[in-house]
């Protein structure tokens, strides 16, 4: 459930309250959901899935009060992938601003201002863990992954400055990808149509042809 569900039924509380905050990578409605895995691993705790598809850091800021109303013991924050994609080029930025109804295009400079502010607002939780964001495609030298790397370097620095735990999602995924026994054939295309084709193509292979997400 989400914070809004918990606040409507506080009697559902069990164990620690763990709030997992982020975007579609946390929501997990397409692909494997790491929040569901946490629920399986820690059944005695209340785990809130506060991932919303497409969210940038500013949007998380706007909804953080309802999450804090649940008095979470632990917060896991992974936010920045959409900020990185929106700031990758002008067309992506305009698309995010239009689709998310934002007052301005997300930029790296704005992210550097808003992420520390968001972490300050979460400081009431007993434990806060900040995640780096995953790669886009499998080519570490691609322009988009160099752009993502810039965000991750700032995330790592922020975790040090705020003295909070860092979960190195990016490094762990790159380590895993380095073990692959197949060559990558495609890489990220910032245009909307190729992205949609790849997303829905992956969904078809998984849900219709029953391939595992790893095989997809």
Please provide the spans of the model-predicted regions.
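Alpha-helical cap/lid subdomain in secreted, periplasmic
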Residues: 12-14, 37-43, 59-216
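Short intrinsically disordered, low-complexity coil segments enriched in acidic
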Residues: 1-4, 19, 127-128, 215
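Short N-terminal or domain-adjacent regulatory/targeting segments
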Residues: 1-15
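Conserved beta-strand elements of the Class I
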Residues: 19-21, 48, 75-77
């Amino acid at each position: 459930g989400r914070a809004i569900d918990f606040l409507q039924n506080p009697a559902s509380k069990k164990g620690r309250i763990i709030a997992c905050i982020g975007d579609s990578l946390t929501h997990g409605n397409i692909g494997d959901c790491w929040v569901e895995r946490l629920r399986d691993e820690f059944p005695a705790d209340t785990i809130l899935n506060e991932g919303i598809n497409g969210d940038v850091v500013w949007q998380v800021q706007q909804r953080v009060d309802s999450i804090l109303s649940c008095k979470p013991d632990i917060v896991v924050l992974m936010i920045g992938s959409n900020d990185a994609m929106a700031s990758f080029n002008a067309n992506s930025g305009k698309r995010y601003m239009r689709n998310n109804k934002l007052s301005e295009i997300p930029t790296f400079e704005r992210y550097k201002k808003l992420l520390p502010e968001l972490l300050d607002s979460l400081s009431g939780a007993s434990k806060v863990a900040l995640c780096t964001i995953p790669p886009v495609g499998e080519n570490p030298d691609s322009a988009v992954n160099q752009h993502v790397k810039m965000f991750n370097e700032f995330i790592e620095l922020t975790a040090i400055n705020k003295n909070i735990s860092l979960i190195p999602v990016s490094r762990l995924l790159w380590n895993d990808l380095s073990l692959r026994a197949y060559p990558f054939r495609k890489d990220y295309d910032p245009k909307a149509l190729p992205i949609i084709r790849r997303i829905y193509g992956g969904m078809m292979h998984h849900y219709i042809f029953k391939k595992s997400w790893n095989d997809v």
